Amino acid sequence: MILERIVTDNLPDLERRKMRLPLAKLQELVLDIPYLPIDMAMKLKGRQVRLIAEVKKASPSKGIIRPDFDPVDIAGIYARNGASAISVLTEEHHFMGSLDNLKKIRESGVASKLPLLRKDFIHDPYQVYESRLYGADAILLIVAMLSPERLQELLSLSHKLGMKCLVEVHTRSELEIALESNARIIGLNNRDLHTFKIDLTVTERLRPLIPPECIVVSESGIQTRADISRLEELGVDAVLVGEALTASVDIAAKMRELL
């Protein structure tokens, strides 16, 4: 299964990072960060559907999506053209991302008013702390790869550090776990992470089951304005779009088309 392989492939890298920067030292550095995270939940509420634009170089299903990849330049385009938040893929082996990309975007100031979402396969408290250190305002938590107990632990730690969580589900049973954990930003992933197949009806089936106090984000497979209009009718608050933007010759023009 693709999800399991991605997690396994990244375990040695995580252990090396722990060796280079032990948890106790990482925690000290996080405590010294002078600024508070930007509230992603506040940015995703509104009368119109909000856009989380993703900085994405490659994927397991498509390979390299954007050969001339400049994460800071792309984030700047997103910030200038209506994005409400920016998702930054940091997984290295299958998506060609990096934590350094997240850090560069934060330190560049090109998106200083927008929350940065670290999109990765997070399963260890160490990753939550390092997300904060590298400039994330929010993190992705995938229910399919976490026990309910670990999900709750990571949610609580993230909130303690001031970060919001996009809690991602693909099935009704995963949604029930997310809601039981009191997740407030729910991501409905139209992509099955075990097969990487897309099905936009996932959002259609699961959206009615989510209470009104939650923020609902539809993820994956969103290519056109018609897709977004359909999701808007279903009552989602935001959409997360990556490939359709980074694969475009003119990213700004594609954003104008979608919004």
From Swiss-Prot:
Keywords: Amino-acid biosynthesis, Aromatic amino acid biosynthesis, Decarboxylase, Lyase, Tryptophan biosynthesis. InterPro entries: Aldolase_TIM, Indole-3-glycerol_P_synth, Indole-3-glycerol_P_synth_dom, Indole-3-GlycerolPSynthase_CS, RibuloseP-bd_barrel. It comes from the Bacteria. One of its GO terms (biological process) is L-tryptophan biosynthetic process. Pathway: Amino-acid biosynthesis; L-tryptophan biosynthesis; L-tryptophan from chorismate: step 4/5. It catalyses: 1-(2-carboxyphenylamino)-1-deoxy-D-ribulose 5-phosphate + H(+) = (1S,2R)-1-C-(indol-3-yl)glycerol 3-phosphate + CO2 + H2O. The keyword Lyase applies. Its EC number is 4.1.1.48. GO terms for molecular function: indole-3-glycerol-phosphate synthase activity; phosphoribosylanthranilate isomerase activity. PANTHER family: INDOLE-3-GLYCEROL-PHOSPHATE SYNTHASE, TRYPTOPHAN BIOSYNTHESIS PROTEIN. Belongs to the TrpC family. This is Indole-3-glycerol phosphate synthase. The gene is trpC.
